[in-house]
């Protein structure tokens, strides 16, 4: 009885102690997978669209998704090209040299990847052409030529809607724009001064005679006078306006301050006579001190 009873107990003791050792390796990967912290995702399109590789890989330690997450987490975020260069001239060189190549070949990451946003006229502009010194293999720190140099001052190709909608303040043609005066034409540019009419001596003589007869020439008379002098009615009207202003100024200069004082005194006397209803008998000298 003792030998039969002691043998199973000695055989069962190592069995109970070895049972947990056999189960731990099976449950350890599951527990580690359950409590494994999720990898940080980046802000790139690949990391946002990619699926989580931890759930799909099972107990195999992750799959292709884990590699995508690791690559997305270690990938450098998008930043402007100018921030990668410490010197301003280097940033300008990188912009001028890298923009046309990236836009033409479609290489690199762009915020506006649509092909409809690229204007062919702008890409063919000489200011955006790639300099031979800025091609692949050259140093990006070499400063380029000036963007607004003398060679880039050619007139731009104006679109029809610019010429039609009077965007520049007045209607003009693209051929009228000078080579070096393109920046002077803008919506806030001053209008050119009106050209003064140069009258001939015979025209001035006839205009002066017409002004002596009548200071105001209107209607058919002005039309007839303009036709006889080979002038427009507007030119004749403006000349008469200026001539009347000159006539009034000359008359005031000839009369002087004494005539103005007499006018003021006679004006007060006329108001007094109208108020008292007295007839105009004698002229009162308003300049005397008596």
Curated annotation (Swiss-Prot):
Q: Which GO terms describe its biological process?
A: brain development; brain morphogenesis; central nervous system development; cerebral cortex neuron differentiation; cerebral cortex regionalization; homeostasis of number of cells; in utero embryonic development; neuroepithelial cell differentiation
Per its record, what are the GO molecular function terms? DNA-binding transcription factor activity, RNA polymerase II-specific; RNA polymerase II cis-regulatory region sequence-specific DNA binding; sequence-specific double-stranded DNA binding
Q: Which GO terms describe its cellular component?
A: chromatin; chromosome; cytoplasm; nucleolus; nucleus
> Pfam families from the xrefs?
Homeodomain
Subcellular localization: Nucleus; Cytoplasm
Keyword hit for Lyase: no
Q: In which tissues is it expressed?
A: Cerebral cortex.
Key words of the record? Cytoplasm, Developmental protein, DNA-binding, Homeobox, Nucleus
Biased composition annotated in UniProt, kind: Basic and acidic residues: 250-263
Q: Which PROSITE patterns does the record associate with it?
A: HOMEOBOX_1 (PS00027), HOMEOBOX_2 (PS50071)
UniProt cross-references to InterPro entries, sorted A to Z: EMX-VAX-Noto_Homeobox_TFs, HD, HD_metazoa, Homeobox_CS, Homeodomain-like_sf
- The highest taxon in the source lineage is Eukaryota
The record places the DNA-binding region at 192-251
Which stretches does the entry tag as region Disordered? 249-290
- What family, per the record? Belongs to the EMX homeobox family.
Function noted in UniProt? Transcription factor, which in cooperation with EMX2, acts to generate the boundary between the roof and archipallium in the developing brain. May function in combinations with OTX1/2 to specify cell fates in the developing central nervous system.
Question: Per its UniProt record, what PANTHER family does this chain match?
Answer: HOMEOBOX PROTEIN EMX-RELATED, HOMEOBOX PROTEIN EMX1
Q: How does it assemble?
A: Interacts with WRD11 (via the N-terminal and the central portion of the protein); the interaction associates EMX1 with GLI3.
Protein's name according to its UniProt entry:
Homeobox protein EMX1
